[in-house]
Structure formats: structure tokens, C-alpha cells
Amino acid sequence: MPTLQNARGVYLITPDTRDTAQLLACTLPLLPHITWLQYRNKQADAALRLAQATALRAACTAHGVPLIINDDAALAQQVGADGVHLGEDDGEVAAARALLGASAIIGVSCYDEIERARAAAAAGANYVAFGAFFPTATKVTTRRATPALLHEAAALGLPRVAIGGITPSQVPELVTAGADLIAVVSGVYAAADPVAAVQAYRAGFTQ
């Protein structure tokens, strides 16, 4: 199982889009400024997901950025991604590990539940994600995580990801509470200047 103690920074998640050219045009300039990229597209069919994931795999490899596939271990295996992110209904860690191998990065959404994080760690997950910390338009959720949850999860010994409506000004608070990675979608992709936005998120780790 890979060790990710040095994982720190911006965990960028792609938006839902069918425009592959636009997705790549926006994402490529961001790769030098992020730690991980997660491919997530809930609107695309299987063929488009494969095409987009394949293109992003090549781009990430060129920039040395790990690519994580959202919710689909089979797609991760197909494109040679570095890992998979599992939500509540996306299968078990053990099954993903069996498919992707010992070196894969497997993350689990834990929402506002420390017990879910403990179970994920026990099952062999490589990181745990909590959120939403703030209101977000990206995903409808009534679950609200708190900074105290990040602190409590330190005992797991895994990288902790914070997600959900986070702005650059809120990054220092979450990092102080224990977040190793800040996951963001619209805060970067919907910004007038996505590169400046991702740099602002990154700067929050040094404040």
C-alpha cells in the first residue's frame, strides 16, 4: 500500500462537461500548481468518460501529477490511473484494491462521519475525505463536516482531505485543523482566472 505522508496541497476535481477540448484547455495550465487531479464527470456516458480520462492520464503523466478516478475502479484500471475515489455507493476498498493493486491510491468519502473514516482506514484506504465544510453548488448535500473532525481523524495516520464550498480564505483554518489536501471544483474552474484561483488556494497552505 503506498504511503502518502507528503501529500499536501490542492486536490483539483474536474467539473461535469461534455466538451473535452475545453476541459483539457482549462486543466493543462493548472497541473503545475496542484498535488492531485480527480476526474469526475457525472454527465458523460462510458465512451466519453474513457476518452476524457485517457486524455487526462496522458497530461497528468507529463506533469507528474497523480490521477484519481471518481467512483469507477474499472475505468481507473482501464486508463492506468493512479487510483480511485470511492463514495458511499461506489463499492468497497477491498474490491478496488484487488482490481488496482497494492500501489493504487484509494480514497474514501467520509462526509461527517469519523466512524466511516476509521472503517476506511481499517480496510486499507490511503486517504479519507470529509465534507461538505461549507455550502456548495457542486453537489447537493445536507451533511456538514467541522474542522474538529479533521483533528480527530489525525489518529488514523492517513492524509485528510477537506471538500465542499471552500474558498481560498478558508484554507488556513482547515489546514490548521489538520487538512492535508483541499479539494476544489468550481472555486477554480468557475473562476475568471483559474490559474490565479488555484494559486490562491495553494497559498493558503503557507499562511
Swiss-Prot record:
Q: In which pathway does it act?
A: Cofactor biosynthesis; thiamine diphosphate biosynthesis; thiamine phosphate from 4-amino-2-methyl-5-diphosphomethylpyrimidine and 4-methyl-5-(2-phosphoethyl)-thiazole: step 1/1
Cofactor names from the entry are: Mg(2+)
Binding locations of Mg(2+): D71, D90
Its Gene Ontology biological processes? thiamine biosynthetic process; thiamine diphosphate biosynthetic process
Q: Which GO terms describe its cellular component?
A: cytoplasm
Reaction catalyzed? 2-[(2R,5Z)-2-carboxy-4-methylthiazol-5(2H)-ylidene]ethyl phosphate + 4-amino-2-methyl-5-(diphosphooxymethyl)pyrimidine + 2 H(+) = thiamine phosphate + CO2 + diphosphate; 2-(2-carboxy-4-methylthiazol-5-yl)ethyl phosphate + 4-amino-2-methyl-5-(diphosphooxymethyl)pyrimidine + 2 H(+) = thiamine phosphate + CO2 + diphosphate; 4-methyl-5-(2-phosphooxyethyl)-thiazole + 4-amino-2-methyl-5-(diphosphooxymethyl)pyrimidine + H(+) = thiamine phosphate + diphosphate
Q: How is the cofactor bound?
A: Binds 1 Mg(2+) ion per subunit.
Which enzyme type, at the first EC level?
transferase
- GO MF annotation list: magnesium ion binding; thiamine-phosphate diphosphorylase activity
Stored InterPro entries? Aldolase_TIM, ThiamineP_synth_sf, ThiamineP_synth_TenI, TMP_synthase
User: What role does this protein play?
Assistant: Condenses 4-methyl-5-(beta-hydroxyethyl)thiazole monophosphate (THZ-P) and 2-methyl-4-amino-5-hydroxymethyl pyrimidine pyrophosphate (HMP-PP) to form thiamine monophosphate (TMP).
Similarity comment: Belongs to the thiamine-phosphate synthase family.
Q: What is this protein called?
A: Thiamine-phosphate synthase
